Amino acid sequence: MAGERRKGMKFSKLYSFKCFKPFSREDHSQIGSRGYSRVVFCNDPDNPEALQLNYRGNYVSTTKYTAANFIPKSLFEQFRRVANIYFLVVAFVSFSPLAPYTAPSVLAPLLIVIGATMVKEGVEDLRRRKQDVEANNRKVEVLGKTGTFVETKWKNLRVGDLVKVHKDEYFPADLLLLSSSYEDGICYVETMNLDGETNLKLKHALEITSDEESIKNFRGMIKCEDPNEHLYSFVGTLYFEGKQYPLSPQQILLRDSKLKNTDYVYGVVVFTGHDTKVMQNATDPPSKRSKIEKKMDQIIYILFSILIVIAFTGSVFFGIATRRDMSDNGKLRRWYLRPDHTTVFYDPRRAVAAAFFHFLTALMLYGYLIPISLYVSIEVVKVLQSIFINQDQEMYHEETDRPARARTSNLNEELGQVDTILSDKTGTLTCNSMEFVKCSIAGTAYGRGMTEVEVALRKQKGLMTQEEVGDNESLSIKEQKAVKGFNFWDERIVDGQWINQPNAELIQKFFRVLAICHTAIPDVNSDTGEITYEAESPDEAAFVIASRELGFEFFSRSQTSISLHEIDHMTGEKVDRVYELLHVLEFSSSRKRMSVIVRNPENRLLLLSKGADSVMFKRLAKHGRQNERETKEHIKKYAEAGLRTLVITYREIDEDEYIVWEEEFLNAKTLVTEDRDALIDAAADKIEKDLILLGSTAVEDKLQKGVPDCIEKLSQAGVKIWVLTGDKTETAINIGYACSLLREGMKQILVTLDSSDIEALEKQGDKEAVAKASFQSIKKQLREGMSQTAAVTDNSAKENSEMFGLVIDGKSLTYALDSKLEKEFLELAIRCNSVICCRSSPKQKALVTRLVKNGTGRTTLAIGDGANDVGMLQEADIGVGISGAEGMQAVMASDFAIAQFRFLERLLLVHGHWCYRRITLMICYFFYKNLAFGFTLFWYEAYASFSGKPAYNDWYMSCYNVFFTSLPVIALGVFDQDVSARLCLKYPLLYQEGVQNVLFSWERILGWMLNGVISSMIIFFLTINTMATQAFRKDGQVVDYSVLGVTMYSSVVWTVNCQMAISINYFTWIQHCFIWGSIGVWYLFLVIYGSLPPTFSTTAFQVFVETSAPSPIYWLVLFLVVFSALLPYFTYRAFQIKFRPMYHDIIVEQRRTERTETAPNAVLGELPVQVEFTLHHLRANLSRRDSWN
C-alpha cells in the first residue's frame, strides 16, 4: 500500500528543490545569542544538559481563571468599572449608622449584577478548561527507552522527544520533520486552526533524516531561535554527525495543524506548551470600543456630578436647618425632635459636622441615579443582536456555505455610524477568480471580446451598440464552455494554430515561461487522468491552465525538474521536455516579480521571469527591448479594460556567471542573521537583469455579484468609499467606473508623479533632489485640487453640485502621507465623493486608514479579504473580513465577517441602523428611568427638610433596576425597529441619522434626562398634593408615609414602563410580556413581600392588600399621575412630528398614509414643509461634514 502511494505521488516533490537543500557553509554567529538561544537534544530528552535547560512542559492552559484565583480575579475585573466601585463603597457604608436603608437591600442588587457577570465568566472559562483537558489528554506515539513507540498523553511530552503522528492527527507540539511515509520525506499539512486556510501546505524533511530505518537511532542537536509568534519563519541549525544543516519553516510542523494525505510522519519536539507558535499567538486582538460606549462613560460621569451636586445642596440646607433648631438664647424651634439630646448627626451645636455626615447619607440615598444594571443589560443586548446578525439568511452565501459572522459584539451600534469605507479591491470588490483573457506577444495583441469592465464602462457612457452586444454574447457562450481560469479566444493561436504565426518561436518561449515559472503543484486524478493545479495564487493557476490549453502542459515536477508536454513549433507534434529546476527566486510585494533558473534539454541555462511592468521594463537589456513600445501600449489598453497585467521576459545565463552568482546566493540563504532576506533579494537582483522582452499577460478578475448596486446604495446613504488597491492607475479607474464608484460626469483629480522633470532627476540618480521635487509636486497638485473643490464646497447645500473623484498612486501617496502634507491630502480627499489609492502597499493601506480615522474623528470601516489587509482592518474602527479565496487571515483579524461585498449593504443599512437606534434609545431610556426614580427621592427629601429618610421601603429601591424595569429595556434593545428592513434599503438616507449621531446627540441625551426630571416632579408633587390632605381610609385618616411611598413608587413603575411602550415603534409579544409583566411583577412582589412579618417587611406590611388596593383614591391618583407624567413627552413628540420630524418619522408617516389612502404619494401633500425641512437639514449636515478642519 505504501509503495503504491509513493508511486502515485511522485509529483509531490515540490519543495525539495535544490534551492532548499541544506548547506554546511552557514554563519552561526547569532546561534546562542539573545533570541537564538534554544538548544534541543534530539531523541535524548533525559540528557543531563537537557534537564538543566528546564524548558516548559507540553501542558497548555487557555483558561482565564483557576479555582484559587477565580473569585478575587473576577471581582477585580468587575470593579474596574467606576459605577461598580461606587456601589461597593455604598454597600460598605450601609453597615454604618449613616445608611438611609438596610445593608441587605443595598447588597442584593450589587450581588445580583456582579454574580450574574461572574457566572457568565465562570461558564465561559469552564468551556475553555474542558477544551484544554481534551487537548492535553490526546494520545501520541513517542519513542520510548526500549526503542519502541508507546502511547502517551500530549501533556507528558518533553522537548527532544521523538514522536510518530498518523494521518488526520493533530501535531502535539512544534516538531522538526524527520521522515514521512513518502520516499522523499514530504508530508501535507492543514493549517486551518492556525491561519484559517483550508488548502494543504507541503512540508519536507532534510534528506539526511528521511531514512525511516535509521530514524529510531537518530541523535542530533538543534540550536534555534527562541519561542516567538511568527508562524511563517524559523531560523535554526541541526548538528548531526559533525555537520551543520540550516533549518527553515519547510521542516517545521506546528502544533494544532493536522497531518493530511500522508500515512505518518516522524518528528522531534522543538517547542512545547506555551512556547509553541500557536500559543505565542494566543493574544487578544486590539481592543475596540464604540463611540457610543465612550460617550456613555461621559454620561455616567455627568450623573455622578448631578449626584454630588444634589447631595451637596441637600446637605447645605440640612446644615442650615439643623443650626436653626437651637437659637442663641437656647430656645428650641423643633422641640419635638429633641435637638438638645441627640447624636452628632443632628446636633445643632455641630451643624457643619452634621451637614457633612448628611452629605455622605445623601450620596447613598440618591445613588439610584446611577444605573447599576446598565453595563450588564447592554452586554446581554449586544450578544443577542449578534445572534440575529449571524442568523440573517439574507447575508448567507449558499455557494460557499458561509453566513455572516459577528466576531465581536462590542461594535454592533458602530455599524450604524460608518462615515467612510476603505476597501481592498482584489477579492473584495472582485471575485479573485482569475481568467486568462488576453495577451501581447512580440508586439502583437491576442484575445477577442470585451471584458466585464469594458462592457460596464461603455454601457455607462451609452456607447454600447447592438452589434457589440451580440458579438460579446457569442464570445460569452464560448467562455461558458471553456475551462475555469481560461476565457481566451483567438483563432490565430488556439488549437495549435500559433505554429503558423510568423513569430511562432517567440510565442513558444512566451507560453513556456508561463508553464515553468511558477510554484504550482500538478494533481493527477488516478481515475480520469485529468490534471488540476494547486497554486499559491489564482493568477498562477490561470497562467498554468492557459499554457496547457495552448499546447504547453505542465504535468510533473520533482525536487530538481519540471516536465512539460509541448507542441514543437517545427513539426507541430507533442513532445515531452524535462527542465532541470535549479533555483526559484520567489515573489514578494517588494520585489514585484518572480523568476526561476532552469537548464533546458539542450543544456542551456535560462532565467525565466515575470513581474509588474513598473519593475520589469527597467531590467530589460538594450537588445531585449524590441516591441517595447507596442507592449506598453497593449498593457495600457489592458489596464483600461480592468485587466491585471504581468510582463514576461527571459534571458540566457553564461555558465561562469551562474557559478559565481550561485555561490553568493547560497551563502545568503544559509545565513542566520536578521538581514538574511535582504541579502537574498540583493543576490537575486544581480541575476535578474539584461532581460529579453517576450510580451505581457492580461487576466480578468470579474466583479462580485451586486457590487455596483451595493456601492450605489451606500453612496446614496452618504457613506464615502475609498478603494485601496495595488493595481495600476488605469486598471483602478476603470474598475471604479464598472462598480459605480466613479460616475460619468464626475470630475477626476489625478495626483501622480509621472512628470518628465522627475524622470530626468531619477535618471541622474540624485535621490535627494528626486524626493524634494516629488514633495513639491504633490504639494502643488493637492493645492490645485483644493482650489477646484473650494467653489463646490462653498455651495455644498445646492442640488446637483459637481462631484469629484480623487485618484492617487502609491508613489504620490508616500509623500501625501508625510506629516507636512497629510492634512491637505485628507481635506482634499474628504471633499471628493470617491477616492482611489492605486499601487498601495499593505503599510500604506493601514496608514491611510489611521489618517482618516484620526483626522476626521468619524467612524471608519475597512473591508478586505487577504493577509495584506490585516493591518488596515485592525486600524479601522470596524474591520470586516471577506471569507474569500485568499485564506482566512483577514476574517480572523476582523470584527465582522461576510462572504460577499454586497452583504455590506444589509450589514450597515439594516443591522447597523437598527443596532445604533436600539442601543442609543436603550441608553437614553436607562438614564431617563433612573432620573425619574432618583429625583422623586430628592423632592421627597426637600419636602421632609432633608431628613435623610427615603420615600420608599428599602427593598422597593433595591428591586427597581433589577426586576421592575430591566427586561423591557432589554427587549427594546433586541427587537425594536423604527422601519422595516425593506424600508431601510429603500430609503438609504435614513442611515445618516447614525452617521450624524442624531439619536445620541447631547441635545437628545439631555432631553431624555430632562424628561426624567420633569416626570419625577409631576409624580411627586401631584401625588403629595392629591393625597396629603385628603381622607384616604374609611375612618377619615389621611395617608401615612408607607401609603404615600407605595403610591409614588407605583406611579414611577407605571410611568417608566408606559414611557417604554409609547417609545417603541415595533411591538412583539415578548415586549408586551416584558412591559406589562414588569408592572404585574411589582404588584406580585408587593403582595408577597407585604405578607411577610413586619420585622422583615417593615413599612410594606399589608400596605397594598389592606390599604392601597381597596382605596379608589389610590387608583384614581395613579391614573392621573401617570397620564400627567407622560403628557410632556406626548406634547413634545406631537410638535416634533408636525414641525420638525426626523427622517424615520416621515417614512413611517408616509407608509401609514399609503396604507390608508390609494394615492402612494399622498403624504407629500400633507407634510411638504416637514419633508423639505428634514431633507434639507440632512443634506446640509451631510455636506457640512465634508469640510474638515
Swiss-Prot record:
The keyword Magnesium applies. Gene3D superfamilies: Calcium-transporting ATPase, cytoplasmic domain N, Calcium-transporting ATPase, cytoplasmic transduction domain A, HAD superfamily/HAD-like. The keyword Transmembrane helix applies. It is found in: Membrane. Its EC number is 7.6.2.1. One of its GO terms (molecular function) is ATP hydrolysis activity. It is a multi-pass membrane protein. Belongs to the cation transport ATPase (P-type) (TC 3.A.3) family. Type IV subfamily. This is Probable phospholipid-transporting ATPase 8. It comes from Arabidopsis thaliana (Mouse-ear cress). The gene is ALA8.
